Amino acid sequence: MQYKGYVGSVEFSESDGVFFGKVQGIQSLISYEGRSVQELVDDFHKAVDDYLALCEAEGSEPEMIDNV
């Protein structure tokens, strides 16, 4: 998945019935999950938006993805 220049992984836990992932190519941990594909995508977008808002609030430069 891609959003605002960030790439996210997609995995599935059969035992929990949950899709999950994390943003790739940066050191900060940005994770997300959902019980459906749409929930996963929505949570991925929200996680990236929350990360960018936090960086702005703290006055720090957000990490950008390395060449993945």
Where do the PLM segments sit?
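Short, charged, surface-exposed hinge/linker loops at domain edges
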Residues: 1-7, 16, 38, 42-68
